[in-house]
Structure formats: C-alpha cells, structure tokens
C-alpha cells in the first residue's frame, strides 16, 4: 500500500477539505476516472480500485495512479479514555476535491476502459465520472 517513506511530522491536524482540485485534465493516458464528489481516499481504497482495473484489462495497456495518500489519520485504541495525548497513526489518506483525475489508462479500447473504471468506481467512497483526453 502507498504511504510516504518519511515525513517532516508524524501527525497532522484534521483540517478541512475545501476548494477545487488541481490535476483536472487527463495528461498521461487517453481515458481517466474523475472525482465528482469530495472526500478522503485511503491507501487501501486506492489499491483496491487499482486491482479491480488491472484484473479487468488483463495486462493490456498502462495504468497511472494520479493520487497519493500523504495525510496520516490517527485513532485511539478501543476502550481508552479521552486525554493522554493524540492517538497513533492508523492509516494514510489522500484528500480529493471535485474535478481531480485519480486514475488514467492508455492502450486499451474505450469500452474496456469504461468497464474497468466502472469496477474501480465501486471501490471508491464518492461519485466519479469517465473522461477522455481533449485533443487540441
């Protein structure tokens, strides 16, 4: 699963997930999966969607993952009283804003790419849409 090799700080504050995304255009592949909603994408969800796509396209073409989980999420253990400091880092997330292209694929027919992205979208916690590269 994806996570940073090293970070400046072990834990971060919760923060908010506002604004519009960068990386809204398909830049590496021909087809992309774009977020319509906003939310957190865990490293496990990123990997589950990647596996679903890879299994469907069966080693044809190439897949790019355009998101990286760089925010640590902490949790306290079960049945522990409040206080006594912040909990331990349990998992990593990528903050996703509307318009972000999360996955791209190239070298496969459009029907195959659509079905692969449909399977991947089932693993994600918000709505997505299929996009194609704009040719100038």
Curated annotation (Swiss-Prot):
Swiss-Prot/TrEMBL keywords: Ribonucleoprotein, Ribosomal protein, RNA-binding, rRNA-binding, tRNA-binding
GO BP: any one term: translation
Entry-linked Pfam families: Ribosomal_L16
Molecular-function annotations in GO: rRNA binding; structural constituent of ribosome; tRNA binding
Known role: Binds 23S rRNA and is also seen to make contacts with the A and possibly P site tRNAs.
Assembly and interaction partners: Part of the 50S ribosomal subunit.
Protein name (record): Large ribosomal subunit protein uL16
Organism, as annotated: Vibrio cholerae serotype O1 (strain ATCC 39315 / El Tor Inaba N16961)
Gene (name only): rplP
């Amino acid at each position: 699963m994806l996570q940073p090799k090293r970070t400046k700080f072990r834990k971060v504050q919760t923060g908010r997930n506002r604004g519009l995304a960068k990386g809204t255009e398909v830049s590496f592949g021909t087809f992309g999966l774009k977020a319509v909603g906003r939310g957190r994408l865990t490293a496990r969800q990123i990997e589950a969607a990647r596996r679903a796509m890879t299994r469907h396209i069966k080693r044809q073409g190439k897949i790019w993952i355009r998101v990286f989980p760089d925010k640590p999420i902490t949790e306290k253990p079960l049945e522990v009283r409040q206080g006594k400091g912040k909990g331990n880092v349990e998992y990593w997330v990528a903050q996703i804003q509307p318009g972000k292209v999360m996955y791209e694929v190239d070298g496969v027919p459009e029907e195959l790419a659509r079905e692969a992205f449909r399977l991947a979208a089932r693993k994600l916690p918000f709505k997505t849409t299929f996009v194609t590269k704009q040719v100038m």
